């Protein structure tokens, strides 16, 4: 019982820090828009945008968890994120492109890792062969 009570303040504190981070980011974005478009935002508007954004992120998190759970997984995958973005075509296209880029980079990284052990094993085989040749020469000399 005491553990649950101890966790609640931590969770509340964590939630408040996340909200503050979202509010700060929204404020920075609003300042950027103000500079580029000469549109001013009141503090109340920034707070409202921050609150809506935070709530939407909570909904996204719950949906992603449900998609993964429905697929009998405990980990959210990029397919879950694509499913979440299915109603926003431009976002879905962007996510798909980035996912493909990451997949290509991963393939290149795996190909390099495969080549590296082969090169290492060749060099170790060559050095062992040289050592054996050297040992054979020493034996024949004695």
Swiss-Prot record:
Quote the subcellular location field of this record. Answer: Nucleus; Chromosome, Centromere; Chromosome, Centromere, Kinetochore
| Keywords recorded for this protein, A-Z | Cell cycle, Cell division, Centromere, Chromosome, DNA damage, DNA repair, DNA-binding, Kinetochore, Mitosis, Nucleus
Entry's Gene3D superfamilies? Answer: Histone, subunit A (1.10.20.10)
* Gene Ontology CC, one term: Fanconi anaemia nuclear complex
What's an example GO BP annotation here?
resolution of meiotic recombination intermediates
Q: Which InterPro entries match?
A: CENP-S/Mhf1 (IPR029003), Histone-fold (IPR009072)
**Keyword Heme listed:** no
**Any one GO molecular function term:** chromatin binding
Q: Which family does it belong to?
A: Belongs to the TAF9 family. CENP-S/MHF1 subfamily.
Concerning PANTHER family, the annotation shows: CENTROMERE PROTEIN S, CORTISTATIN
Oligomeric state and partners?
A: Heterodimer with CENPX, sometimes called MHF; this interaction stabilizes both partners. MHF heterodimers can assemble to form tetrameric structures. MHF also coassemble with CENPT-CENPW heterodimers at centromeres to form the tetrameric CENP-T-W-S-X complex. Forms a discrete complex with FANCM and CENPX, called FANCM-MHF; this interaction, probably mediated by direct binding between CENPS and FANCM, leads to synergistic activation of double-stranded DNA binding and strongly stimulates FANCM-mediated DNA remodeling.
Its annotated function is as follows: DNA-binding component of the Fanconi anemia (FA) core complex. Required for the normal activation of the FA pathway, leading to monoubiquitination of the FANCI-FANCD2 complex in response to DNA damage, cellular resistance to DNA cross-linking drugs, and prevention of chromosomal breakage. In complex with CENPX (MHF heterodimer), crucial cofactor for FANCM in both binding and ATP-dependent remodeling of DNA. Stabilizes FANCM. In complex with CENPX and FANCM (but not other FANC proteins), rapidly recruited to blocked forks and promotes gene conversion at blocked replication forks.
Question: What is the official name of this protein in its record?
Answer: Centromere protein S
State the organism named in the record.
Mus musculus (Mouse)
């Amino acid at each position: 019982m005491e553990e649950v009570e101890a966790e609640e303040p931590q969770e509340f504190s964590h939630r408040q820090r996340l909200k503050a981070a979202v509010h700060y980011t929204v404020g920075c974005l609003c300042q950027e828009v103000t500079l580029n478009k000469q549109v001013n935002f009141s503090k109340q508007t920034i707070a409202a945008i921050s609150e809506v954004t935070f709530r939407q992120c909570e909904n996204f998190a719950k949906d992603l968890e449900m998609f993964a759970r429905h697929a009998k997984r405990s980990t959210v995958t990029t397919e879950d994120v694509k499913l979440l973005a299915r109603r926003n075509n431009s976002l879905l296209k962007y996510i798909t492109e980035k996912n493909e880029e990451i997949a290509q980079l991963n393939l290149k990284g795996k190909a390099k890792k495969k080549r590296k052990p082969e090169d290492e094993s060749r060099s170790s085989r060559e050095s062992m062969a040289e050592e054996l040749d050297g040992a054979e020469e020493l034996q024949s000399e004695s």
